[in-house]
């Protein structure tokens, strides 16, 4: 089912012969860029590919694991590289018009007869097989991607289906977790994101709305009603600034929000000409954002004005000015006024950096890697692509 030919691994593209939509970076592997990719075949055996990307060497397949039924999402556990969750449709009655974007919507509610499940799996030490450890039971409707603690602990996970949010107990490979809290009771839940900077804070998207939650107390903490004009496909918290959240969806807009002032977004980017399926902050340089769309492209954005780099550089500048102003006057010889040269630095501009066009089908998923500037994208036709932030940006950002 897979193109396992590794004789030419200098390419940044790896082709799978089945349709795909599930992609997860293995975050527990800090020193290598490894990803799990799952297929969504309706009537054939499905598989998960373990792929590795090395700069200068391209992409290669390390192993292939059989997996039951069509895979809709994968979440690698940040506390153990051998563990991952998958969400899969056991009925096999999903959409089968692969070339029609409208029929590839994994968040619509017209699939009531489908039986979605989510299980925790373990990759064995020799990386040649996987074992199902347990199933997260009790969901109704379509299960969304499982959310793990972004701090890397195994203290809890969060799952979402079409209407409810569930907080689960500690995850390990010995004991099945239990549901600690269930809340939400919403319509058309599509995606969630855990804030890595504020304890117990979760954001969810349902239809065109965004809500914030204290998930330990099951209480709503903020709300953006009609955040988008059409369905929201992805949300993601800034990993370095506590109150900033991005959202993207079917209105082709990428929006940035301050969760303390939710009336209007603080920034809007336009550039895609069809639905945005995935949008992610860079964990190390949060001014970098990647988006993927059913216009078959991936876009890289620069959001300097709302980044932690902007705050840091302004603080340093203000500190230097204050130190200079506090020096005794006798140590400051009078100098004639000098014209200030304003050097334009494109790193400091909020703008589209680059559009990547290696895909020929809807790009459902994207993910940053363990490396600061390498990212992966996955399209429905089975094409897995790795790319880098342009050198002119990465060279500058490396010194921040």
Curated annotation (Swiss-Prot):
One of its GO terms (cellular component) is phagocytic vesicle. The keyword rRNA-binding does not apply. Coiled coil: none annotated. Residues 95-114, 314-348 are annotated as: Disordered. It comes from the Eukaryota. Keywords: Repeat, WD repeat. Residues 96-114, 314-333 have a biased composition (Low complexity). The keyword Cell division does not apply. Belongs to the WD repeat EIPR1 family. This is EARP-interacting protein homolog.
């Amino acid at each position: 089912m897979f193109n396992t030919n590794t004789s030419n691994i200098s390419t940044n593209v790896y082709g799978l012969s089945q349709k795909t939509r599930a992609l997860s970076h293995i975050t527990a592997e800090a020193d290598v860029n490894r990803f799990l990719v799952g297929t969504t075949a309706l009537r054939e055996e499905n598989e998960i590919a373990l792929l590795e990307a090395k700069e200068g060497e391209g992409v290669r397949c390390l192993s292939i694991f059989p997996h039951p039924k069509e895979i809709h999402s994968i979440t690698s556990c940040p506390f153990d590289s051998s563990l991952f969750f998958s969400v899969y449709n056991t009925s096999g009655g999903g959409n089968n018009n692969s070339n029609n974007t409208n029929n590839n919507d994994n968040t619509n509610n017209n699939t009531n007869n489908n039986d979605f499940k989510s299980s925790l799996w373990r990759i064995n030490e020799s990386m040649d097989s996987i074992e199902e450890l347990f199933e997260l039971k009790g969901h109704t409707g379509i299960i969304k991607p499982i959310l793990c603690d972004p701090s890397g602990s195994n203290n809890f996970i969060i799952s979402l289906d079409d209407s409810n949010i569930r907080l689960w107990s500690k995850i390990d490979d010995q004991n099945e977790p239990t549901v600690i809290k269930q809340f939400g009771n919403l319509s058309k839940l599509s995606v969630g994101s855990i804030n890595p900077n504020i304890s117990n804070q979760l954001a969810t998207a349902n239809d065109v709305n965004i809500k914030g939650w204290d998930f330990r107390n099951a209480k709503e903490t903020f709300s953006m009603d009609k955040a988008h004009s059409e369905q929201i496909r992805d949300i993601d918290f800034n990993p370095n600034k506590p109150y900033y959240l991005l959202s993207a969806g079917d209105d082709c807009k990428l929006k940035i929000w301050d969760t303390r002032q939710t009336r209007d977004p603080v920034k809007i980017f336009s550039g895609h000409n069809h639905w945005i399926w995935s949008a992610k902050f860079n964990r190390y340089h949060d001014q970098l954002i990647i988006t993927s769309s059913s216009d078959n492209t991936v876009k890289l954005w620069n959001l300097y004005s709302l980044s932690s780099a902007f705050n840091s550089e302004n603080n340093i500048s203000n500190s230097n000015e204050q130190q200079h102003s506090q020096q005794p006057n006798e140590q400051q010889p009078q100098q004639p006024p000098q014209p200030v040269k304003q050097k334009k630095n494109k790193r400091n501009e909020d703008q589209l950096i680059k559009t990547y066009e290696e895909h020929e089908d809807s790009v459902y998923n994207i993910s940053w890697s363990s490396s600061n500037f390498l990212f992966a994208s996955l399209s429905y036709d089975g094409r897995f692509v790795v790319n880098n932030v342009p050198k002119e940006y990465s060279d500058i950002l490396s010194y921040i």
